[in-house]
């Protein structure tokens, strides 16, 4: 009953209204790294494909003093233009862009921004404003208060897009939410976790619930373990100051990987509405106990074996006595009928041997009969790079003898959908925010439940100074104990069939 009432209220206050006309996007932090690498390229991608509202204006706001021409020069430098056509489109895009400089904690600065917004909106019927906070968390609260006090539209819809991190633990997250509450309704807040905008992550619901053969085996009776892996081949590269404050668990696992886990584990929502989907995700989180230290290993990268790559603590921006983990593997457990007893293994690390994010679902062994020693089936979802889904399965090797070989059913997106462009995650999420669709954004109770899971572990690691991360070489797979750790939770790595994907050669596995 209450949920129905809430959704009715949302429709009345405009939170689910698609913004089609009379819209301004304000990018706060317009001269920063996030705006340069993600926000402006995404806005240009939407503009190129005609997904932005008609007559939209894009206002940049930052502390950096620069005139209009200097600002446009920066915007152009953010975006690649490999063809003449794209260069002409960028010229048109720049005509939508203006810039205002100001401080983040001064009324006069935001009054000046409000005056600029009113000037460019003077011929509009409504003042719909989307505020994109591409800002460090230290100024979130101050800026949100200033926006509400000075720049909130009198006649139109206001939305605020907030980037992670949403706090450092449960209490700081709650403090942040409490500070936002007086000024912004929950339905006006869009908390971005860009993994929810990735094509393969968005495909999880369709794949699970739109294919009965998956849905029927998606439980503890058929699945032995689930792995969610995030690997980066580079280190902090001069960003150690930021990273050392948060570490790999806060940076990747409490948000990106946990969001993927909830989509894998949730029950079928009753509809595709944002609230129904997020209700099911929250139910999964509430069925999970806090992560236990005994279910965790942490590491920190050292020099590469050839000495060409520096150790984490050799980064000038990192404290020499840092205990910050750059690698973590941990196991989460879901206490419900579907998943009780199935370990969810999450692994994330920097300075590893490759760039990869994937989901690996390993099915149970064939327990008896003539095939009892055959390799396990696996469903692998490659999130990035080279988006794909493949099923590792056993097949008879062509020939006169009864030999088996591990092969795969393979859906590689760039081959199957070669004529379609996979959108960038930020393009997808900004478009969702313009539409008022919260499905791929993080709700307040969802955020609370995720921090409840991780905060005890984070405090345990922070408070116990004697806990030192295991060192692993830059460019390796991670700490040397990793394989033993995953094996202790049931994961079976099998190279008996000489299996490779993509397939390059075949070695039979004789029965």
UniProtKB/Swiss-Prot annotation:
First-tier enzyme category under EC: oxidoreductase
Family named by the database record: Belongs to the glucose-6-phosphate dehydrogenase family.
A single cellular component GO annotation: cytosol
Gene3D superfamilies noted in UniProt: Dihydrodipicolinate Reductase, domain 2, NAD(P)-binding Rossmann-like Domain
UniProt-listed HAMAP family: G6PD
Binding site for D-glucose 6-phosphate: 164, 194-198, 232, 251, 350, 384
GO MF annotation: an example: NADP binding
Protein's organism: Emericella nidulans (strain FGSC A4 / ATCC 38163 / CBS 112.46 / NRRL 194 / M139) (Aspergillus nidulans)
Pathway: Carbohydrate degradation; pentose phosphate pathway; D-ribulose 5-phosphate from D-glucose 6-phosphate (oxidative stage): step 1/3
PANTHER family: GLUCOSE-6-PHOSPHATE 1-DEHYDROGENASE, GLUCOSE-6-PHOSPHATE 1-DEHYDROGENASE G6PD
Binding site for NADP(+) 1: 29-36, 63, 164
Keywords: Carbohydrate metabolism, Glucose metabolism, NADP, Oxidoreductase
Record field: catalytic activity: D-glucose 6-phosphate + NADP(+) = 6-phospho-D-glucono-1,5-lactone + NADPH + H(+)
Annotated EC: 1.1.1.49
InterPro entries per record: G6P_DH, G6P_DH_AS, G6P_DH_C, G6P_DH_NAD-bd, NAD(P)-bd_dom_sf
Function summary: Catalyzes the rate-limiting step of the oxidative pentose-phosphate pathway, which represents a route for the dissimilation of carbohydrates besides glycolysis. The main function of this enzyme is to provide reducing power (NADPH) and pentose phosphates for fatty acid and nucleic acid synthesis.
GO biological process, one term: pentose-phosphate shunt, oxidative branch
Protein name: Glucose-6-phosphate 1-dehydrogenase
Chain positions recorded as NADP(+) 2 binding sites: 347, 356, 360, 382, 390-392, 410-412, 477
PROSITE patterns, A to Z: G6P_DEHYDROGENASE
Active site: 256
């Amino acid at each position: 009953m209450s949920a129905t009432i809430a959704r009715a209220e949302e429709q009345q206050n405009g939170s689910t209204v698609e913004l089609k006309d009379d819209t301004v996007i304000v990018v706060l932090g317009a001269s920063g790294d996030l705006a340069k690498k993600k926000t402006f390229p995404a806005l240009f991608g939407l503009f190129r494909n005609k997904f932005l509202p008609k007559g939209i204006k894009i206002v940049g706001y930052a502390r950096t003093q620069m005139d209009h021409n200097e600002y446009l020069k920066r915007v152009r430098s953010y975006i690649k233009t490999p063809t003449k056509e794209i260069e002409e489109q960028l010229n048109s895009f720049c005509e939508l862009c203006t810039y205002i400089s100001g401080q983040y904690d001064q009324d006069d600065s935001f009054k000046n921004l409000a005056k600029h917004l009113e000037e460019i909106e003077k011929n509009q019927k409504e003042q719909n404003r989307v505020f994109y906070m591409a800002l460090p968390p230290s100024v979130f609260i101050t800026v949100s208060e200033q926006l509400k006090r000075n720049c909130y539209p009198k006649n139109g819809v206001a939305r605020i897009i907030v980037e992670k991190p949403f706090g450092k633990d449960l209490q700081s997250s709650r403090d942040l939410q409490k500070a936002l509450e007086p000024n912004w309704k929950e339905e006006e807040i869009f908390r971005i976790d860009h993994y929810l905008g990735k094509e393969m992550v968005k495909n999880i619901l369709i794949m699970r619930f739109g294919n009965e053969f998956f849905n029927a085996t998606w439980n503890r009776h058929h699945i032995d373990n689930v792995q969610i892996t995030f690997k980066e081949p580079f280190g902090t590269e001069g960003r150690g100051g930021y990273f050392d404050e948060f570490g790999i668990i806060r940076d990747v696992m409490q948000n990106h990987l946990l969001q993927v886990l909830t989509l894998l584990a949730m029950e079928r929502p009753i509809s595709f509405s944002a609230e129904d989907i997020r209700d099911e995700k929250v139910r999964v989180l509430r069925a999970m106990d806090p992560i236990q230290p005994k279910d965790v290993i942490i590491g920190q990268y050292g020099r590469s074996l050839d000495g060409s790559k520096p150790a984490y603590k050799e980064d000038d921006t990192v404290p020499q006595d840092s205990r910050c983990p750059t690698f973590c593997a941990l196991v989460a457990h879901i206490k419900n009928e579907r998943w009780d007893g199935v370990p969810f293994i999450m692994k994330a690390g920097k300075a590893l041997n490759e760039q990869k994010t994937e989901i690996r679902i390993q099915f149970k062994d064939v327990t008896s009969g003539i095939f009892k020693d055959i390799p396990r089936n696996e469903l692998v979802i490659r999130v990035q790079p080279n988006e794909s889904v493949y099923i590792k399965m056993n097949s008879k090797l062509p020939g006169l003898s009864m030999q088996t070989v591990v092969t795969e059913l393979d859906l590689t997106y760039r081959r199957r959908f070669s004529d379609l462009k996979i959108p960038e995650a930020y393009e997808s999420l900004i478009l969702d925010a313009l539409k008022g669709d919260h499905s791929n954004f993080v709700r307040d109770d969802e955020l609370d439940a995720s921090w409840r899971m991780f905060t005890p572990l984070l405090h345990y690691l922070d408070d116990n100074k004697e806990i030192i991360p295991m060192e692993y070489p830059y460019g390796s797979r991670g700490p040397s104990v990793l394989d033993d750790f995953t094996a202790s939770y049931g994961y079976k790595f099998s190279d008996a069939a000489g299996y490779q994907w993509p397939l390059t050669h075949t070695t039979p596995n004789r029965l």
